[in-house]
Amino acid sequence: MKKISFLLLLAIVICSIGWTDGQFTDVRCSASSKCWPVCKKLFGTYKGKCKNSKCRCYS
């Protein structure tokens, strides 16, 4: 029973990581490299990805 509880808790923690650290922008993109200067300008970090043709920046 402890093993199942531990695995369930671990799964919840892993699934909840990263839900709030990404910030969407209205800037359209075709590749993640297009988002890097946008994220640097808006949020001061080069960490960004192109998701659903929009830049998403991470802190």
UniProtKB/Swiss-Prot annotation:
Residues 1-22 form the signal peptide. The record marks 58 as: Aromatic residue of the functional dyad. It is found in: Secreted. The record marks 49 as: Basic residue of the functional dyad. Gene3D superfamilies: Knottin, scorpion toxin-like. Keywords: Calcium-activated potassium channel impairing toxin, Disulfide bond, Ion channel impairing toxin, Neurotoxin, Potassium channel impairing toxin, Pyrrolidone carboxylic acid, Secreted, Signal, Toxin, Voltage-gated potassium channel impairing toxin. The modification Pyrrolidone carboxylic acid is found at residue 23. GO terms for molecular function: ion channel inhibitor activity; potassium channel regulator activity; toxin activity. Has the structural arrangement of an alpha-helix connected to a beta-sheet by disulfide bonds (CSalpha/beta). This is Potassium channel toxin alpha-KTx 1.14.
